[in-house]
């Protein structure tokens, strides 16, 4: 649809305009000339400027007038009818004067004046259903303003009101508002004093206030008691937490102590495994009785050395029957059951070879009593001098039983290297200066009848002394008939296996009482002779 079809009049109108005479141009100018002058707008001001904008009614009237001037607004039909009447009058006058060309020019130039003039009634009727955007915008503004006015009437401020002034509290009838109380006071002032009904009203209100105050006090006390209850619970929880922490600390301390005790017990058990007692323990030995009888006066080692020197078996005894477990016999002497292997000389370990000295057990050594107790003879055996030195006879390498000439004891100075060394079933005595003026600790093994000299560690000694004595220790381990639990041997077990097990000799000529007796033989070594040997070295 083109603009000419909708916005301009029909073709018959243009034909009528063309047929008009040209003389009507002057009249057209006289009619529309005033629109070209600015004073025309001042003489005819806009209708919405004449009213006061501050007035609400004037604003609404101006909006209604502007809505009527809209093109598509169906309300503005009056203005369109007026415009149509003006157009008809203009056409009639133009046809009468014959100024058709001037009328056409003036009609086309009227666009600049108002675009509303070119719309025909047909166009307005056709677009009557279209809603104007301007009118809709103005209507929305009116609706929002009306909604805002209605909201202010319904708004009630309850945030700053007391509780008894809220509508909910007033519905319960328990309180009166300030206005109601003021009205009651005024009514009391205006009423007479003798009116009973007026006198009851303030009394009732006062009672209500007192009851309300009492209720508030009760609520306050309840809240305080509940607060105290919560505080008590909190204190109990805090005490429980403190007790739990204290118990945890105690348990942790106990656990640490138990761990330390367990470590100590494990270390002690490992040390105890280093020593294993022999399978068979003799009932009584010569050394046991000697230590029991001479324990307070023991200060020398000469008695045990004399036993070793005079440890020859009795006449008529069979040397092949000397075993470790032999029960027959009258004397037990500490002898070597195996021959020590050849070892390299070591300057750090001085060796003392004590020559054997024959003993006569029947005459001058000991006499057996019928009750089994032995008495020591006080003869001249202690003053006997050893005039000759005789080397110890070599033992039989193929058999673990000693020969008849094997009566020498080899006493070595050993080093105590293990700091945790333990020596059960024995006694350790402090160093003794009487025997050859040598410093050392002597170990008396009661169970195996052994005498061992233990010396302190020599710093200047070779760092590997175990390599020198490895062969002899291996032979002793293989032939000593003592069971050990571990392959690794300590210094304590080595010292206990140096001299070998005890042996007993049998004598068929002795009686039962004499054979069952235990002898204590004391033949000390002469100091002069031993001192001479010590100085000769």
Curated annotation (Swiss-Prot):
CC annotations in GO: nucleus
| Stretches the record annotates as Disordered | 344-406
Q: Where is the composition biased (Low complexity)?
A: 371-383, 392-406
Keyword annotations for this protein, in alphabetical order, are:
Cell cycle, Cell division, Developmental protein, Mitosis, Nucleus
| UniProt superkingdom | Eukaryota
- Location within or outside the cell: Nucleus
Biological process terms in GO annotation: cell division
Q: What does this protein do?
A: Has a role in localizing bicoid mRNA at the anterior margin of the oocyte during oogenesis, and a poorly characterized role in nuclear divisions in early embryogenesis.
Q: How does it assemble?
A: May be constituted of a homo- or heterodimer.
Name assigned to this protein: Protein swallow
Q: Which organism is it from?
A: Drosophila pseudoobscura pseudoobscura
């Amino acid at each position: 649809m083109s603009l000419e079809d909708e916005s301009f009049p029909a073709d018959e109108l243009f034909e009528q305009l063309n047929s008009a005479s040209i003389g009507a141009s002057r009249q057209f100018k006289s009619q529309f000339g005033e629109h070209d002058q600015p004073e025309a707008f001042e003489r005819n001001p806009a209708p919405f400027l004449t009213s006061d904008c501050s007035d609400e009614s004037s604003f609404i009237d101006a909006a209604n007038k502007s809505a009527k001037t809209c093109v598509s607004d169906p309300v503005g039909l009056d203005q369109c009818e007026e415009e149509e009447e003006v157009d008809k009058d203009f056409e009639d006058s133009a046809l009468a004067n014959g100024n058709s060309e001037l009328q056409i020019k003036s009609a086309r130039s009227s666009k600049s004046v108002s675009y509303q003039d070119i719309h025909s009634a047909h166009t307005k009727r056709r677009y009557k259903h279209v809603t104007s955007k301007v009118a809709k915008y103005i209507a929305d503004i009116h609706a929002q303003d009306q909604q805002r006015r209605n909201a202010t009437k319904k708004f009630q401020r309850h945030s700053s009101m007391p509780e008894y002034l809220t509508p909910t509290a007033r519905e319960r009838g328990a309180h009166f508002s300030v206005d109601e109380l003021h009205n009651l006071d005024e009514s009391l002032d205006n009423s007479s004093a003798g009116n009973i009904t007026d006198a009851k009203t303030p009394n009732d209100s006062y009672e209500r206030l007192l009851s309300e105050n009492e209720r508030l006090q009760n609520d306050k006390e309840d809240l305080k008691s509940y607060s105290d209850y919560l505080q008590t619970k909190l204190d109990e929880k805090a005490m429980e937490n403190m007790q739990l922490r204290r118990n945890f600390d105690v348990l942790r301390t106990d656990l640490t102590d138990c761990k330390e005790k367990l470590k100590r017990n494990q270390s002690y058990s490992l040390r105890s495994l280093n020593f294993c007692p022999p399978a068979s323990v003799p009932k009584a030995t010569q050394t046991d009785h000697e230590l029991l009888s001479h324990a307070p006066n023991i200060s020398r080692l000469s008695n045990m050395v004399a036993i070793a020197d005079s440890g020859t078996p009795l006449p008529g005894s069979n040397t092949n029957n000397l075993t470790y477990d032999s029960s027959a016999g009258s004397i037990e002497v500490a002898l070597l059951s195996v021959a020590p292997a050849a070892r390299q000389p070591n300057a750090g370990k001085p060796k003392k070879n004590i020559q054997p000295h024959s003993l006569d057990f029947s005459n001058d050594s000991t006499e057996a009593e019928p009750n089994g107790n032995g008495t020591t003879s006080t003869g001249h055996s202690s003053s006997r001098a050893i005039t000759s030195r005789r080397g110890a006879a070599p033992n039989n390498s193929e058999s673990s039983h000693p020969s008849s000439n094997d009566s020498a004891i080899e006493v070595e100075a050993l080093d105590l290297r293990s700091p945790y060394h333990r020596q059960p079933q024995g006694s350790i005595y402090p160093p003794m200066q009487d025997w050859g003026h040598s410093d050392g600790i002597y170990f008396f093994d009661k169970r195996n009848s052994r005498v061992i000299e233990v010396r302190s560690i020599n710093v200047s000694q070779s760092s590997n002394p175990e390599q020198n004595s490895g062969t002899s220790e291996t032979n002793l381990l293989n032939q000593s008939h003592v069971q050990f639990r571990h392959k690794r041997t300590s210094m304590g077990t080595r010292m206990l296996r140096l001299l070998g097990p005890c042996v007993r000799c049998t004598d068929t000529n002795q009686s039962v009482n004499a054979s069952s007796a235990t002898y204590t033989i004391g033949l000390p070594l002469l100091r002069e002779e031993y001192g001479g040997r010590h100085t000769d070295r």
